[in-house]
């Protein structure tokens, strides 16, 4: 009240009024600017004049019991005056110092857990090595990069549910934790943060950093993985770069890297199978990366790479609308075109049918090591501005653009026949034929393209047919720029369709991706990739195929045995035997198969000649299309370890060795598993298999008529009983089952029951 009175007195003096109204501060706009809203408009100034006051801080009244009125030096720490307009106390900055030195301490055990991202960053920087600084022009291009090392890949919604569950478990609201990763993280974090005293909001913020991928569109010249991006400000400026090796890897970068390798391997393998799309899906669903299902990673991980995007398209996920050609990502920035089939003649007079894009279009092309802007009309390159790390990278971009332009002089530059094939030995489409041809050798293409004199434009120079720079002349329409072309920034995803040959199209039918675009680069994955699919057995070479095939037969012996006796054709066609065929010499495949199938048929016909070990050993050979011949073999050859090795039809060999005592099989010295049944009692195995669908009731019962042969059993009605002759002339009583459900267990129980019935 005192002050208000004082103000009234001041205002009544004309001089005060004059100062306040005539000086420039009386701009309503300025007054509004500094007084409206809660947001501080000049924080630095505010801080300065606040700190000049004796008691700039307010605190809860309880502070008076927790802090003495004066410190050791006798300075006052808080004032008895109340803060105007609240019931808080005015406190000196010295009180903060006192609190930090003498205040209560809490347990620090949770700090490293809550602030994990920061603690880990410090470790990475501590162990990282910074190299020399180089001054040079930096070709930076904006790319979408991950700025948050060490995160899981949950969606914002999934992360929100996890955070609520961990930090505010008693809050109301439906939370559904479905994915495996959500459940694991929630459990782990709840345990870590028991009795945590850190403010829940802070914990929530830090959890978000750990769970969600954060991306930014930043200018980058070097590495794009998150451990490089976190030190971007230290490693590259406008005209300098500093070498840096991170002091540790983070799982999210490893996941991205391993995902790309797995996807490439899977697409390459699927391409050569009979039904590429079905095979690809089967492999994606049965593969794990670092212990997490690949399909879960694909759903969450935004990595854009050709093979990864093909896998995503196969799973029905949306992908980026840009398309890929020659390893470059093309994004149309303006113009439009219609497509028309046209026949063209190469320099070798070979006819090619190409889909011509008619119309004016502009594209950005972004590759790993070069970028470009391309302007083209119908079968004509108008302008190409390219920038890249080195001569080689620039040349790659120029070749791709020249082929993409579909110009006649490019097609006429073809020397020799075009007959490139993919991994499945199918001819590539004409555009990829041309691309492969010129990627092998582009001399004629560059020589025939033509050159033109150039104007002096800032930041641009010419490039000659031999790929040397020039300021006078350049390849027609082509210029090299110092500046990179930014990657397409939008994160928009579109619905796509995929055909069985793995060609991905947008809704207008434009091909965005095809297996030809998948890089052949081999790398070593950072995380363990576990391919459970038989199609990937061969990725580790012939030995792995051999061991895996036999392991598979042993693991599935119960079902295999039944199929062997009842539906062999279906068994021979199983995809698990496909990889094995590549080990059998081509010339012998059909003869081996015919021989083994005949042998198996004799076993089925003549009861008692059933030999489990021999069936397992020879089964993979029967999968090839058989050739009918009278040939007999005592050993079969497989190509492993760089030469042919023999598998003996009767008896053990280094390739296939069954130890009767331990009942274990070793293939090429590697353990392939144990046989659960006794091979000597194999006859019972077959009969029980043949008696599938019948219940063995006991010894022969004369009331049910003479003993039938196994083949005559099929005429029985459900629930009907009959005597049947099995094995070495024994007769047992059986009943045809009323239900088909328990068929599989029959073969196991039958073995025991036959023994009981006979004995």
Curated annotation (Swiss-Prot):
UniProt keyword terms in alphabetical order: Cap snatching, Eukaryotic host gene expression shutoff by virus, Eukaryotic host transcription shutoff by virus, Host gene expression shutoff by virus, Host mitochondrion, Host nucleus, Host-virus interaction, Inhibition of host innate immune response by virus, Inhibition of host MAVS by virus, Inhibition of host RLR pathway by virus, Inhibition of host RNA polymerase II by virus, mRNA capping, mRNA processing, Viral immunoevasion, Viral transcription, Virion
Cell compartments where the protein resides: Virion; Host nucleus; Host mitochondrion
BP GO terms, sorted: 7-methylguanosine mRNA capping; cap snatching; DNA-templated transcription; symbiont-mediated suppression of host cytoplasmic pattern recognition receptor signaling pathway via inhibition of MAVS activity; symbiont-mediated suppression of host gene expression; symbiont-mediated suppression of host mRNA transcription via inhibition of RNA polymerase II activity; viral RNA genome replication
A GO CC term attached to the entry: host cell nucleus
Domain of life: Viruses
Chain ranges passing through the membrane: none
Protein family according to the UniProt entry: Belongs to the influenza viruses PB2 family.
Protein name as catalogued: Polymerase basic protein 2
Taxonomy of the source species: Viruses, Riboviria, Orthornavirae, Negarnaviricota, Polyploviricotina
């Amino acid at each position: 009240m005192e002050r208000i009175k004082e103000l009234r007195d001041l205002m009544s003096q004309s001089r005060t009024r004059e100062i306040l109204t005539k000086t420039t501060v009386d701009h309503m706009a300025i007054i509004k600017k500094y007084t409206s809203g809660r947001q501080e408009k000049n924080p630095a100034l505010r801080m300065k004049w606040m700190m000049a006051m004796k008691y700039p801080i307010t605190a809860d009244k309880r502070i008076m019991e927790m802090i003495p009125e004066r410190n050791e030096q006798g300075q006052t720490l808080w004032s008895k005056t109340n803060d105007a307009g609240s019931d808080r106390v005015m406190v000196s900055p010295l009180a903060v110092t006192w609190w930090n030195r003498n205040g209560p301490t809490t347990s620090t055990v949770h700090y490293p857990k809550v602030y994990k991202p920061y603690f880990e960053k410090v470790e990475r920087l501590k162990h990282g090595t910074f190299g020399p600084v180089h001054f040079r022009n930096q070709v930076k291009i904006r790319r979408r990069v991950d700025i948050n090392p060490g995160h899981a890949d949950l969606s914002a919604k999934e992360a929100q549910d996890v955070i609520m569950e961990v930090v505010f478990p008693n809050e109301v609201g439906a939370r559904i934790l479905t994915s495996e990763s959500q459940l694991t993280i929630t459990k782990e974090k709840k345990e870590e943060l028991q009795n945590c005293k850190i403010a829940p909001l802070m914990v929530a913020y830090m959890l978000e950093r750990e769970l969600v991928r954060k991306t930014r569109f930043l200018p980058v010249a070097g590495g794009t993985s998150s451990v490089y991006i976190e030190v971007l400000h230290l490693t590259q400026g406008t005209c300098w770069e500093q070498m840096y090796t991170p002091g540790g890897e983070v799982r999210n970068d490893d996941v991205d890297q391993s995902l790309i390798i797995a996807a490439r391997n899977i697409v390459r393998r699927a391409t050569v199978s009979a039904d590429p799309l079905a095979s690809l899906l089967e492999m994606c669903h049965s593969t794990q990366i670092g212990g997490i299902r690949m399909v879960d990673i694909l759903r969450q991980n935004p990595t854009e790479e050709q093979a990864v995007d093909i896998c995503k398209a196969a799973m029905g996920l949306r992908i980026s609308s840009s398309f890929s050609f020659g390893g470059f990502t093309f994004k149309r920035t303006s113009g439009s075109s219609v497509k028309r089939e046209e026949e063209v003649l190469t320099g070798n007079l070979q006819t090619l049918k190409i889909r011509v894009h008619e119309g004016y279009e502009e594209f950005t092309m972004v590759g790993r090591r070069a970028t470009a802007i391309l302007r083209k009309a119908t079968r004509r390159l108008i302008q190409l501005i390219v920038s890249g790390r080195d001569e080689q990278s620039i040349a790659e971009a120029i070749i791709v653009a020249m082929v993409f332009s579909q110009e006649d002089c490019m097609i006429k530059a073809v020397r020799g026949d075009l007959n490139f094939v993919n991994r499945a030995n199918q001819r590539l489409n004409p555009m990829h034929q041309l691309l492969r041809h010129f990627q092998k050798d582009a001399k004629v293409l560059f020589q025939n393209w033509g050159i033109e004199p150039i104007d002096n434009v800032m930041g641009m120079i010419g490039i000659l047919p031999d790929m040397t720079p020039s300021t006078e002349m350049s390849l027609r329409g082509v210029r090299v720029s110092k500046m990179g072309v930014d990657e397409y920034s939008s994160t928009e995803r579109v619905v796509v369709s995929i055909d069985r040959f793995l060609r991905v199209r947008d809704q207008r039918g434009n091909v965005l991706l095809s297996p030809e675009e998948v890089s052949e680069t081999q790398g070593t994955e950072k995380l363990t990739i576990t391919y459970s699919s038989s199609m990937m057995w061969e990725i580790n070479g012939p030995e792995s195929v051999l061991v895996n095939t036999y392991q598979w037969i042993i693991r599935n012996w119960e079902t295999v045995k039944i199929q062997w006796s009842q539906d062999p054709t279906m068994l021979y066609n199983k995809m698990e035997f496909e990889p094995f065929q590549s080990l059998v010499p081509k010339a012998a495949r059909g003869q081996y198969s015919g021989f083994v199938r005949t042998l198996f048929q004799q076993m089925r016909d003549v009861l008692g000649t059933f030999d489990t070990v021999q069936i397992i050993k020879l089964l993979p050979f029967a999968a090839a299309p058989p050739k009918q011949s009278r040939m007999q073999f005592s050993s079969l050859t497989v190509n492993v370890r760089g030469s042919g090795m023999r598998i003996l039809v009767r008896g053990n060999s280094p390739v296939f060795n069954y130890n009767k005592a331990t009942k274990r099989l070793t293939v090429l010295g590697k353990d392939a598993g144990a046989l659960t049944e006794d091979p000597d009692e194999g006859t019972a195995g077959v009969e029980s298999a043949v008696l599938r669908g019948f219940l063995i009731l006991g010894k022969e019962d004369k009331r049910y008529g003479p003993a039938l042969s196994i083949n005559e059993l099929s005429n029985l009605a459900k629930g009907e009983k009959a005597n049947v002759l099995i094995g070495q002339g024994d007769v047992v009583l059986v009943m045809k089952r009323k239900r088909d459900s328990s068929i599989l267990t029959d073969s196991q129980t039958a073995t025991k029951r036959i023994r009981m019935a006979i004995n």
